[in-house]
Amino acid sequence: MTRFLLCSFALVLLYPSGIDMYLVGLPRIAQDLGASEAQLHIAFSVYLAGMASAMLFAGRIADRSGRKPVAIVGAVIFVVASLLCAQAHASSHFLVGRFIQGIGAGSCYVVAFAILRDTLDDRRRAKVLSLLNGITCIIPVLAPVLGHLIMLKYPWQSLFYTMTGMGVMVGLLSVFILRETRPTAHPQTATPQHGGSESLLNRFFLSRILITTLSVTAILTYVNVSPVLMMEEMGFDRGTYSMAMALMAMISMAVSFSTPFALSLFTPRTLMLTSQVLFLAAGLALSLATRQTLTLIGLGMICAGFSVGFGVAMSQALGPFTLRAGVASSVLGIAQVCGSSLWIWLAAIIGLSAMNMLIGILIACSIVSLVLLLVVTPPRVAQYDEEAAVES
């Protein structure tokens, strides 16, 4: 079991590392490539577009050909793309490299969740996904620090060489440590009754797609508007802003690492309801805030709400799928990436302020999710195939 957890964690961490590590070198990258920082900020969207593109096919391939081949190919693509970014001499080449890098990270991301679905039952999977969320929260804190230390002595290309090394390590883990976990039965050989229970259009799965997508949209909106809120509206300098973001990351980590213990005391539904109540409270606190302290409390509740509920919701979403876990993971990833991008784009088009953009998604997320949690209940455990057929 340890090998599956180690490989899954490594596969997932390529995604946030590819986002956070290069940001510290953005001014120098823009200078060397003859582009403005604003032009290169699109590299974030390009990276997410690459991830979404990979998710369109990676899950289906993983269900047909196995998790291990997709993990290996994804790691190789990430390595090649990181080298392309390091060798770029024009912004267009850099953006192409970032898109391909997103394809590699997206492939690995999908496979990681499929592996966890293959190897863990509902309760253990919810605990592991909560821990994984906590580990992922460490990356936004550590990656910029590591990037800064690297750039004290080396050029910005070294950031992508570091990512290359990470991709190589993930590839080696996938080749030598990871074992195939895809169930031996093929989806087309499943019985009609079994196949019906794994429909992507069943009401429970659709409800969890919406809940997780809204939750991801809320947390990404917070990340996107935090510089404007803290540095422009609250008057923080860069140092104070970094300290505040580190504090929020610590809240996320503390709650994520506590959630597995909470699952021993409370039901998953209780934790998911708590998550949405925290989102609602955060929205109300931000809308009523007249002091910085209340604003920071509201932002802290966003981090806590996401951390306590997201892993549990993802576990429930994947629960009904044994033979189609890869496709289900892909659908979840695509919905989350596209949904969050759509909201941020629409809010910018409408002209919402940073604070109103955040308050709007928090209120909408909490109300819609609370209704879904109260109305749409999980299928009976008997309908799940909790005994995963793991190939040795």
Curated annotation (Swiss-Prot):
Protein's cellular compartments: Cell inner membrane
PANTHER family reported in the protein's UniProt record: CHLORAMPHENICOL EFFLUX PUMP RV0191 (PTHR43124:SF3), PURINE EFFLUX PUMP PBUE (PTHR43124)
InterPro entries the UniProt entry points to: MFS, MFS_dom, MFS_Efflux_Transporters, MFS_trans_sf, Multidrug-R_MdtL
Gene Ontology molecular function, alphabetical: transmembrane transporter activity
Transmembrane segments: 4-24, 38-58, 70-90, 95-115, 131-151, 158-178, 209-229, 246-266, 270-290, 294-314, 331-351, 357-377
GO cellular component: plasma membrane
Main location, first listed in the record: membrane
UniProt key word Disulfide bond: no
Keywords linked to the UniProt accession: Cell inner membrane, Cell membrane, Membrane, Transmembrane, Transmembrane helix, Transport
Name recorded for this polypeptide: Multidrug resistance protein MdtL
Membrane topology of the entry: Multi-pass membrane protein
Domain of life: Bacteria
